[in-house]
């Protein structure tokens, strides 16, 4: 709704500027939100600079030329010094309520757009995911959900490293040490992987065996490939379980080895050579990207002729470029250099480059993590801690409920807290995940937003019992005139613009912030305005419809954040 409000304001302002004797492009209208209006334009500043006139006088001149069409979302336009302020009218407010009631879960969805292939998580299958990995998963999954709601056709992929050095170590470890298959499969893999690294540190001579395994895989040795596949399958099966619990889904798992077997890796190396950028450095084949601003060369082939992860990743990206209109990668900050080199190399051979979302790292108060050293808290362990603490809270708040209810709510609240607390921070900022704070209702995180949704559900259930409320009965939104009612309607109307912003800038945290603000607006409304207790029947019906609208938009926001919206807590 807000996007349409802005579009109408743009049209009205552009026409008024034309009538005032000036010309301006849409991009020069410079709209912004303001505490003094629903939209404010700085166009008078722009025009004053060009025509050497007083911006305050120009703003008044433009406003005097404004004509608001019948039925417009704009109710009033005024000048405030050099600013041109736009105020939403009754058609906008009433239209928002009616749109939410009609569209329900479709409210905030954009028109169909391009096809996007988005890759995220893609952690090495050498053990369980830890909290560092799941920031990638949460950012990527939330972005996919935002993009889908914005109208994009999104396919999400996980790129499986099934043949790199770490996987060679995993395969070697599985042959050397016994797997404890009574444990979750990715944890069993981590156990032997950690043991193998201890062994390799003590006896560096074994590294030759690792190198030999990698050469055999590249040469297509069937038995070695089978051992690699078995180890990788076990790890990936466990990783999928973890992601499923976090409400993260991938449409496709793509194996790195696919591109070696198909000949795509060989082909892309030959095409890179043809650019004249390659040279030999200590027997290895490297790419000179100095004209792209990279002093460090990119190694694409080892001295023994085997390919690297990066080489295979280049082939993967070329394949992806043919699958979609846009390619998006979600990488940690440690991939900043390599992702830049990858983009430059693809550009050099005429392949569509990916858009890259780089995120800084998340840590726990306990410190840093490393799968190789065995110094990590798995995502599974973290989830168990958080949901366990959430269960205790539910038991305290709702002792009369069943064990199944408590367990279900604890899982929704605990995992919601993890997702929200991680995604609420802008990707480029590092963060420390403190699960106790994430579960604190006073911190206004996921539990607070979920509770606001449950509260709306509870009000509506009570209304059906006590006030004979009929949700299908037509209501009059124009009866919603209190400040807190109007504030809530305007906040709901912002949903489509928040989705649009998150999709355009690939910033999922804007939706997390919005969801909290929406919960605030709903709770303020309910605090100051009687709903079921409203004396006038028509006003009561309108306010209950507004509660229903808030429930819908809170649910849509939580769903797009990948968080369960409980009906009762």
Swiss-Prot record:
The keyword Thylakoid does not apply. It comes from the Archaea. Keywords: Aminoacyl-tRNA synthetase, ATP-binding, Cytoplasm, Ligase, Nucleotide-binding, Protein biosynthesis. Disulfide bonds: none annotated. It holds the Pfam family DALR_1. The keyword ATP-binding applies. Coiled coil: none annotated. It catalyses: tRNA(Arg) + L-arginine + ATP = L-arginyl-tRNA(Arg) + AMP + diphosphate. InterPro entries: aa-tRNA-synth_I_CS (IPR001412), Arg-tRNA-ligase (IPR001278), Arg-tRNA-synth_N (IPR005148), Arg-tRNA-synth_N_sf (IPR036695), ArgRS_core (IPR035684), DALR_anticod-bd (IPR008909), Rossmann-like_a/b/a_fold (IPR014729), tRNAsynth_Ia_anticodon-bd (IPR009080). One of its GO terms (cellular component) is cytoplasm. GO terms for biological process: arginyl-tRNA aminoacylation. Its EC number is 6.1.1.19. It is found in: Cytoplasm. A motif ('HIGH' region) lies at residues 123-133. GO terms for molecular function: arginine-tRNA ligase activity; ATP binding. Belongs to the class-I aminoacyl-tRNA synthetase family. This is Arginine--tRNA ligase. It comes from Methanosarcina mazei (strain ATCC BAA-159 / DSM 3647 / Goe1 / Go1 / JCM 11833 / OCM 88) (Methanosarcina frisia).
């Amino acid at each position: 709704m807000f996007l349409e409000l802005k579009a109408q304001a743009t049209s009205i302002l552009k026409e008024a500027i034309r009538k005032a004797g000036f010309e301006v492009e849409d991009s020069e209208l410079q709209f912004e939100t303001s505490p003094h209006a629903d939209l404010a334009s700085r166009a008078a500043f722009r025009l004053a600079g060009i025509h050497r006139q007083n911006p305050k006088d120009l703003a008044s001149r433009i406003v005097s030329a404004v004509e608001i069409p019948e039925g417009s979302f704009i109710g009033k336009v005024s000048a405030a010094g050099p600013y041109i302020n736009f105020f939403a009218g009754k058609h906008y407010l009433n239209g928002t309520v009616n749109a939410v009631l009609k569209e329900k879960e479709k409210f905030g969805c954009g028109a169909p757009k391009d096809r996007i292939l988005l890759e995220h998580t893609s952690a090495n299958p050498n053990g369980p995911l830890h909290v560092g990995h799941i920031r990638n998963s949460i950012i990527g999954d939330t972005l996919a959900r935002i993009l889908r709601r914005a109208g994009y056709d999104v396919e999400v992929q996980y790129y499986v490293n099934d043949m790199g050095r770490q996987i060679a170590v995993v395969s070697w470890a599985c042959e050397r040490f016994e797997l404890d298959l009574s444990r979750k499969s990715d944890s069993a893999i981590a156990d032997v992987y950690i043991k193998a690294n201890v062994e390799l540190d003590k006896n560096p001579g074994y590294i030759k065996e690792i190198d030999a395994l990698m050469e055999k895989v590249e040469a297509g040795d069937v038995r070695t490939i089978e051992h690699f596949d078995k180890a990788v399958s076990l790890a990936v099966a466990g990783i999928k379980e973890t992601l499923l619990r976090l409400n993260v889904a991938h449409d496709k798992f793509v194996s790195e080895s696919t591109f070696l077997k198909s000949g795509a890796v060989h082909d892309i190396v030959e095409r890179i050579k043809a650019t004249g950028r390659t040279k030999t450095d200590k027997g290895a084949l490297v790419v000179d990207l100095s004209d792209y601003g990279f002093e460090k060369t990119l190694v694409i082939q080892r001295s023994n002729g085997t390919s690297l992860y990066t080489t295979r990743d280049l082939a993967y990206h070329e394949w992806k470029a043919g699958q979609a209109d846009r390619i998006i990668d979600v990488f940690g900050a440690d991939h900043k250099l390599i992702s830049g080199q990858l983009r430059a190399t693809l550009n050099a051979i005429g392949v569509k480059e990916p858009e890259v979302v780089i995120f800084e790292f998340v840590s726990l108060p306990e410190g840093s993590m490393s799968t190789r050293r065995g110094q990590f808290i798995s995502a599974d362990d973290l989830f168990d801690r958080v949901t366990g603490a959430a269960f205790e809270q539910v038991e305290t708040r709702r002792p009369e409920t069943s064990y199944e209810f408590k367990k279900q709510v604890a899982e929704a609240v605990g995992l919601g807290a993890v997702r929200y607390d991680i995604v609420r921070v802008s990707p480029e900022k590092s963060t420390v995940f403190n699960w106790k704070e994430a579960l604190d209702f006073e911190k206004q995180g996921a539990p607070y937003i979920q509770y606001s949704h449950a509260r709306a559900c509870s009000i509506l259930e009570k209304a059906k019992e006590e006030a004979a409320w009929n949700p299908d009965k037509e209501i009059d939104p124009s009866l919603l005139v209190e400040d807190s009612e109007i504030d809530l309607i305007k906040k709901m109307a912002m949903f489509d613009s928040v989705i649009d912003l998150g999709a355009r800038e690939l910033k999922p945290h804007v939706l997390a912030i919005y969801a909290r603000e929406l919960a605030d607006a709903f709770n303020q409304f309910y605090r100051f305005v009687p709903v079921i207790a409203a004396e006038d029947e028509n006003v009561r019906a309108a306010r209950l419809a507004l509660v229903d609208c808030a429930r819908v938009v809170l649910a849509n926001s939580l769903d797009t954040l990948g968080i369960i919206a409980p009906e009762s807590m």
